[in-house]
Amino acid sequence: LWVDLLDEGRSVLLDLGELGHVANRKLLRVERVVVTHTHMDHFVGFDHMLRLTLGREKELVVTGPAGFLDRVRGRIAAYTWNLIEDYPVRLKAEEIDGDTVRSVIYRGAGRMEPEPLPDRPFTGVIHGERLYTLHVEVLDHGIPVLGVALRETEHISVNKDRLRRMDLVPGEWLRELKHAVRRCEAGEQEIRIETTNDGERVFTRAELAAEIILRSPGQRLAYVTDIRYTPENVARAVELARDADLLVCEAAFLDEDRALADERFHLTARQAGELARAAGAKRLAPFHLSPRYQGREQEVLDEAAEAFGGPVLTLSTESSGF
C-alpha cells in the first residue's frame, strides 16, 4: 500500500509485495517502509526497492517484525557489492523484537555490510514528526506480524470558497503555503499571486494562512493483514485502528470458509467487517482476497459491508492519499 503524504513529496510504503505496477517516480518518494512479515507476497518487492535506492541520497528506513534483520541480510548478501563504494545508498533496517527495536544500517561506502546501531525501547511508535506518527502493534499469524497505523498530527486544507472570493488563481504556491504552515514557517515572506482578472496581489505567508488555510484533526489510516481471528489479535487490532478514517484490512475468505481461514491464520470478510465496526472506523477497504473467489469478489465485499455497517471501498491498485 503506497501512502502519499500530500504536498510533501514524500510517501510511506506498507509491505513490499510485487512493485512492478507502481511507477518508479512514486517509489523514489518513499522514505519509510513497514513490512508486516516476510511471507513472499509481502516481501518479494524488496530487491526492486533496493535497486531503486542505490543511487539516491535520501536514507530509506525499513521496519519489520522479529527476525527481519536476518531476512534483510540474506537478501543483500545474495549480491556482489565490489563496485558500490561510490554510491550514496543508505538503507536502515530495523526489527521489533519484544520490547526492543534493533537496527543496522547498510551503506555503499561500507560495501553493504550491516553496521549495528544502538538498540532502543519499543514503545508502539516507530516514527514521529510534526506531520505524522507511525504506530505498530505485534499481531499473530502463526509468526509475528505487524499491524500499522499512520496518524496525521493535523490536517491542513484550503478554503476553496474563500480562495475564489479573493480572485486568486490556484497554483504551486498553495502547496508551498500548506508545507510552510505544517512546519510553522508561515511568516512574513511575501508571495506574489496572479488574480483571475489578470492582475496580481501580494501577501505575506502569514496573511494568506489566516485568510484561506483550514485546520482540522489529522486523518488516521490503519492497515491490518494476515491475522487469525483470536480474542488477543482482535483486541490489539481494534485498539490500533480505533477511530481510523480508513481501515485497510484483509478479507481473505468468505465466512462460509471460516474453518479454512482459521487453519491458515487469516480473516474472513465478515470478521474484517466486525473488526472495523468494533474499532469505530469510518471506512473499510477489504483487500488480500483469496484467488479461490475469482469472479466472486463482490460477494466478499458485500459480506464485509454487511458486518461493518458502513462504507466499504476498493482501493486503487497501489495507493492511498493522506
PLM features: what roles do these ranges have?
Residues 1-27, 32, 59, 148-150, ...:
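Conserved beta-strand hairpin/beta-sheet module of binuclear metal-dependent hydrolase folds
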Residues 18-64:
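Active-site metal-binding motif and surrounding structural segment of the metallo-beta-lactamase
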Residues 90-104, 211-215, 231-322:
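Binuclear metal-ion centers of metallo-dependent hydrolases, dominated by the metallo-beta-lactamase
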Residues 14-16, 31-41, 65, 222-228, ...:
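Active-site neighborhood of phospho(di)ester-bond hydrolases with catalytic His/Asp-centered motifs
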Residues 103-234, 239, 246:
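Active-site-proximal loop/helix segment associated with metal-binding centers of metalloenzymes
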Residues 30, 55-60, 218-219, 279-286:
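Short, surface-exposed connector motifs at secondary-structure boundaries
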Residues 59, 71-119, 292:
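Active-site neighborhood of divalent metal-dependent phosphoester bond hydrolases
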Residues 48-52, 80-81, 294-303:
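Metal-dependent catalytic neighborhoods of phosphoester/phosphodiester hydrolases
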